[in-house]
Amino acid sequence: MTLLPVVADAPTLPVSVVAVPAARMEHGFKTYGSGDTEVRALDDVTVAFAAGGFTAIMGPSGSGKSTLMHCLVGLDDITSGAVFIGEENVTEMNERQRTWLRRERIGFVFQSFNLIPTLTAIENIVLPERRAKKDVDHLWLDTVIAQVHLNDRLTHTPNELSGGQQQRVAVARALVSRPQIIFADEPTGNLDSKAGAEILRFLRRTVDEFGQTIVMVSHDPVAASYADRIVFLADGRIADEMQHPTPAAIPDHLKELDT
């Protein structure tokens, strides 16, 4: 087992969480402004994300999807309530502890890839490990690279890669540290349908084969259908949930949120 470095003020986190959700929010409120200008972005949200599950978050524009994700990972504070990653209360952490948590336990995949243009694919993939001065698990790295089919593109820089290939690099980067949970924000938003499907199939495989936990924000019913479960938000509240979603059934739920 790889030992974690000692970091001042860093919480003690479990290596694996089985009995408790990978992430959860309890009675979360997030407000901006006050009085007549107050906007409630999250309104008494209680939601949990099971370890080893794939959950999609959907809802109309302005429903609170991005706010929920930002609060779950400690990038933004909730006004009241509690947020947990595993058994650790993110709400009680200081900024140093939250930074450590995101580096050690959370993976991110963004719509815009967020690759360093001067680095090769392999250098981008291992960059988080290098910055943290951690030894790279080369056996696991080889497994991830093989899964995303990047073996013949490792020495290419981002401008030499297609959009789909760049996103595969981003997914590999998120996985290489074996995070407790991956948060994906519209990961196929900048891709064509074929490249997007490749990314979604890979994310699905990481859940099925490696037990990875994924929480994905998406507006696309086809993308969301790869998840085990969808949480629907509307006006900052949990409006509905769907288990085993299908592309045909999801639009009906979205229409109901707009009525």
Language-model-derived ranges and their functions:
Residues 20-227, 233, 238:
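ABC family nucleotide-binding domain
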